Amino acid sequence: NQTGKVKGLTNTKIRQALNLATDRKSISQSVSEGLDGIPTGMTPAGLAKTATGGDFAKAAAKATAYAYNIKKAKKLFAEGMKEAGLKKMTLTVEGTSDSTTSKSTLDTIQQTWEQLPGLTVKEKFVPFKQRLQDAANGNFQVILTDWIADYAEATTFLGLFTSDSPNNDGKWVSKEYDQAINAAESKDALNSKARIADEVRAEKILYQNSAVNPVYWVNSPVLTNPKVKGILNFSSGAGSYYMHAYISKK
């Protein structure tokens, strides 16, 4: 929440420290025994393509550096706390009470974030509907949320954080970011190379400002009988479509 309700979260160095103090590998291990992907950006791997057919996530990873580095996190946190005029800070992180993954995720976040001197982390769990309402109303300090792609393009995720997006629950504002997304969705929309460059720039701005903290990319394992044919799998929307599915006699 960057509305100013939480003193400290409007400081970029403090947010950067929280990102660096997030052990995504341990979170993936606790949530799915390592099945879920370790994010290198906001846009998950396998969703969108570059102009040359490569994975957009790999292109974006060259502009970001999401990594667990507690030593650097402590340094930035100390600098940020001094700039904010704080000696101690307590953060409440909200998750969904009817989700086992929320508990595992918040436990790991609490464990690593509290390595930052002067920081106390409290966990708060509410029902799913309440969590959605709290996010929409800005009634949170830090909140664990998720998103499923509506279409196979990076802007389905990156568009969440423009200043006028109804899904920008943290109320982070960046004119530079808005310009990058606006360019990707308007003047560069039909120019793949230019559009991808805009989207990579947006990923870089998100990372540099620590406007969001991606903790894991969800991977969904599926066990399919080899006799079942014709199932269509997509990286966006409903994911799997069975309209053409059939059982082979072979």
Identify the residue ranges that each predicted region occupies.
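Structural transition elements
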Residues: 38-79, 99-102, 190
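Alpha-helical secondary-structure segments
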Residues: 1-41, 88-100, 189-208
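Extracytoplasmic/secreted envelope proteins and their assembly/folding machinery
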Residues: 11, 15, 19, 24, ...
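Ligand/substrate-recognition segments at binding pockets and active sites
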Residues: 78-149, 220
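Pocket-flanking alpha-helical
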Residues: 8, 26-31, 129-163, 206-207
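Long beta-strand-rich cores associated with HINT superfamily self-processing modules
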Residues: 222-250
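Extracytoplasmic/peripheral linker and loop segments enriched in polar/acidic and small residues
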Residues: 13-16, 28-29, 65-66, 120-131, ...
